[in-house]
């Protein structure tokens, strides 16, 4: 892979194509070691998840100590007003105009609300935010978000926390083909390193992981596995895989074979 093969997010060049979440780990120490082992340069955080000032201070100090770029999110928001308010709070607290916009429309499968997402995206972009919207694998929705000014899109692979992988690789592939200039990050639903590898093989620019690492038997080892998988997937994409065929083709030359083997 060339040394200048960077992930680009709103003009910033990032070496790692793995973004990592900061929730659900069995302990702060495991979270810290897992983040380091992943090689990630961007960590997502939720302002809502800190229950007490003391716990919040400890958490932020751990995150700051990693030296990674923070991508705050609006996890848990169900309305446009709620998401806008939280996004503005995040901008003040974290001193960044990046926001991972999450607006849930269904509590059963945590599917994003496409209508509220479009409305909130426009408001935030008009207010100077650089929005990274968490969305479904719907082509038209992704096109609309891109047209509003989202340079980065984050379609799901499957519902959050399911670990099912890429349920609709056709849709994801279509989005990649139709939006060649957008930075595309598969967010949610990945469970195995092979899922992340597949996303990169499809031409996606990165993956965002949380449950797949935090919920593993050994999160630190799983972080290393995902790091290797993402690198392998990007290598494979850049190498341009052989075309798939419906008919077998021998890999061994037939020249020099006995004539009775060529009948």
Swiss-Prot record:
Kindly list the GO CC terms recorded for this protein.
Answer: cytoplasm
Q: Which GO terms describe its biological process?
A: thiamine diphosphate biosynthetic process
First-listed, main subcellular location of the protein, grouped into a coarse class? cytoplasm
**Keywords assigned:** Cytoplasm, Schiff base, Thiamine biosynthesis, Transferase
Q: CDD domains from the xrefs?
A: ThiG
Q: Which reaction does it catalyse?
A: [ThiS sulfur-carrier protein]-C-terminal-Gly-aminoethanethioate + 2-iminoacetate + 1-deoxy-D-xylulose 5-phosphate = [ThiS sulfur-carrier protein]-C-terminal Gly-Gly + 2-[(2R,5Z)-2-carboxy-4-methylthiazol-5(2H)-ylidene]ethyl phosphate + 2 H2O + H(+)
Residues of the active site are: 100 (schiff-base intermediate with dxp)
Please tell me whether the keyword Cytoplasm is annotated for this protein: yes
Compartments in which it is found: Cytoplasm
Q: Where does 1-deoxy-D-xylulose 5-phosphate bind?
A: 161, 188-189, 210-211
- EC number(s) of the enzyme? 2.8.1.10
Q: Show the GO MF annotations.
A: thiazole synthase activity
| Pathway membership | Cofactor biosynthesis; thiamine diphosphate biosynthesis
What class does this enzyme belong to in the EC scheme? Answer: transferase
Q: How does the record describe its quaternary structure?
A: Homotetramer. Forms heterodimers with either ThiH or ThiS.
Function of this protein?
Catalyzes the rearrangement of 1-deoxy-D-xylulose 5-phosphate (DXP) to produce the thiazole phosphate moiety of thiamine. Sulfur is provided by the thiocarboxylate moiety of the carrier protein ThiS. In vitro, sulfur can be provided by H(2)S.
- What family does the Swiss-Prot or TrEMBL record give for this protein? Belongs to the ThiG family.
What name does the UniProt record give this protein?
Thiazole synthase
Species this chain originates from: Pseudoalteromonas translucida (strain TAC 125)
Upper lineage? Bacteria, Pseudomonadati, Pseudomonadota, Gammaproteobacteria, Alteromonadales
